[in-house]
Structure formats: structure tokens, C-alpha cells
Swiss-Prot record:
<dbReference type="Pfam" id="PF06971">
    <property type="entry name" value="Put_DNA-bind_N"/>
</dbReference>
<keyword id="KW-0805">Transcription regulation</keyword>
<dbReference type="InterPro" id="IPR036390">
    <property type="entry name" value="WH_DNA-bd_sf"/>
</dbReference>
<dbReference type="InterPro" id="IPR003781">
    <property type="entry name" value="CoA-bd"/>
</dbReference>
<keyword id="KW-0678">Repressor</keyword>
<protein>
    <recommendedName>
        <fullName>Redox-sensing transcriptional repressor Rex</fullName>
    </recommendedName>
</protein>
<dbReference type="GO" id="GO:0051775">
    <property type="term" value="P:response to redox state"/>
</dbReference>
<keyword id="KW-0238">DNA-binding</keyword>
<comment type="subunit">
    <text>Homodimer.</text>
</comment>
<dbReference type="InterPro" id="IPR022876">
    <property type="entry name" value="Tscrpt_rep_Rex"/>
</dbReference>
<dbReference type="GO" id="GO:0005737">
    <property type="term" value="C:cytoplasm"/>
</dbReference>
<dbReference type="GO" id="GO:0003677">
    <property type="term" value="F:DNA binding"/>
</dbReference>
<dbReference type="InterPro" id="IPR036388">
    <property type="entry name" value="WH-like_DNA-bd_sf"/>
</dbReference>
<dbReference type="Pfam" id="PF02629">
    <property type="entry name" value="CoA_binding"/>
</dbReference>
<keyword id="KW-0963">Cytoplasm</keyword>
<feature type="DNA-binding region" description="H-T-H motif">
    <location>
        <begin position="16"/>
        <end position="55"/>
    </location>
</feature>
<keyword id="KW-0520">NAD</keyword>
Length: 209
């Protein structure tokens, strides 16, 4: 099936499946059932089977799924052999944490540079990542950088996004409360930690387990 037709909800679950399958492979497990996958990733087995069905016959009834085959399949589907180079804009507490973490569990995703306006941070390295002045954004971003993580104050988020839109960046992971407006050729994922926490608290109060 053409991946353009895969539901976005399914696409968001693929990295979750891939990480668990990686762990299974490392443990030496040869096959896994949808029920086992369901228990591990907390997605019901019917949804897993439906997700997998978009890609054709990945398993056999009564046997389950071959772990090595799934690992190879999802590795190719998720382009795990292609390095995604990332720039981080805003080296505050959250940005600094990202630089130290630098997606150590994702061998194909690397933050390669960061930008800030603080004189104390510009010209230094954090987690081995060079920090440049925000004024150098357009100059420093090469065609290899296609994704940016935005951890700046909300008041300047739109202005920074406008500048990113004029570079090679095609995807923005926005950790600010601001809802950004950019051209259609740029994809934005908004992650508002305060909203996520409020949602969790709401579910805890209204949908007790």
C-alpha cells in the first residue's frame, strides 16, 4: 500500500512498534504475537493487526510475526539507515536537556547544532553540540538540516519559525505554547507539555482505572 494512504494515527505508532521489536531481537526472541505486542506497547491487538495490515502480510495466523522480518521491514519503512540531522533553537533548560540526551536511542537522529542569544552559551559546546548565535541561523543551516526543534520563548516562536521557513528545514518540533503559521511545505508537530499534563490530570480524575 502507498504509505501516503496510511492513517496518521498508524504512522505515529510505527516508531513505538519498531523500538519494542528492536528489544525483542536483542533478547534473541524469534517470533511474537499481536497479543504480546499489545501488552508491551499498550495498544490493543486488533489495532496492531489493522496497523500491520496496511503493509500487507507481515505475519501468519497461528504463528504470529517473525521478529527479524519485522525488524528489517520497519527499519526500511522508517528509513533507519538514513541519518536525520537536526538543529535546536533555544538553549534553555529544556533545550539543554535535549542536547545532553541527543536521541541516544535513535541512531538515525542527531542534533548537530544549536542556536541561542545568550552570551554565556554562544560559542560553547553542550553535550558535544556547538551553540551558535541566533543571528547566524540562515548562514549555519546547511541543506543537510531538515528538522528543527523549537524550545524558545513563545513570544519569539513565530519569528523564528518564519526564518526557518526560508531555510532547508521541512519539519519543526514545536515545544512552545505558540501555534505557528508557516507555509504548507513545512510540517509542524506541537508538543505543549502543560497541555499534556492537564490532559493527564483530567483523565486521572474523570476516568479512574
Amino acid at each position: 500500500m502507498d504509505q501516503q494512504k496510511i492513517p496518521q494515527a498508524t504512522a505515529k505508532r510505527l516508531p513505538l512498534y519498531y523500538r519494542f521489536i528492536q528489544n525483542l531481537s536483542l533478547s534473541g526472541k524469534q517470533r511474537v504475537s499481536s497479543a504480546e505486542l499489545s501488552e508491551a506497547v499498550k495498544v490493543d491487538s486488533a489495532t496492531i493487526r489493522r496497523d500491520f495490515s496496511y503493509f500487507g502480510a507481515l505475519g501468519k495466523k497461528g504463528y504470529g510475526y517473525n521478529v527479524n522480518y519485522l525488524l528489517s521491514f520497519f527499519r526500511e519503512t522508517l528509513d533507519q539507515d538514513d541519518i536525520t540531522r537536526v538543529a535546536l533553537i533555544g538553549v534553555g533548560n529544556l533545550g539543554t536537556a535535549f542536547l545532553h540526551y541527543n536521541f541516544t536511542k535513535n541512531n538515525n537522529t542527531k542534533i548537530e547544532m544549536a542556536f541561542d542569544v545568550s552570551e554565556e552559551k554562544v560559542g560553547t559546546e553542550i553535550g558535544g553540540i556547538p551553540v551558535y548565535h541566533l543571528d547566524e541561523l540562515e548562514e549555519r543551516l546547511s541543506n543537510d538540516i531538515q528538522v528543527a526543534i523549537l524550545t524558545v520563548p513563545a513570544t519569539v516562536a513565530q519569528a523564528v519559525a518564519d526564518r526557518l521557513a526560508e531555510t532547508s528545514v521541512h519539519g519543526i518540533l514545536n515545544f512552545t505554547p505558540a501555534r505557528l503559521n508557516v507555509s504548507e511545505n513545512i510540517r509542524i508537530h506541537h508538543i505543549d507539555l502543560a497541555v499534556e499534563l492537564q490532559t493527564l490530570v483530567y483523565f486521572l480524575k474523570n476516568y479512574p482505572q
